[in-house]
């Protein structure tokens, strides 16, 4: 429970800092979502799309899964792509992998 409290405290402090830097940040963020990019990336906690791209929340629509896979049977991923293209009108789709991906290593290791 202590770690959960710490997360909420960190979130509150982050929100206060953002609000101090830009008092209308959350208002602007809530009013629209018009990203130019759909990022399909790995769930690995070391590769967050916004930070890798240097973009703010709202600038990139993100779908993450283990090993950044796009498979025709993954309806979650397909619905994200459809929503991004048809509703958000993204201009670019980025499928981004990374070195030493545990998901890719696991998938390539099984010969079944």
Please provide the spans of the model-predicted regions.
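Short HxH-centered metal-ligating active-site micro-motif
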Residues: 56-112
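Short, conserved "active-site rim" segments that organize catalytic pockets and cofactor/ligand binding
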Residues: 1-71
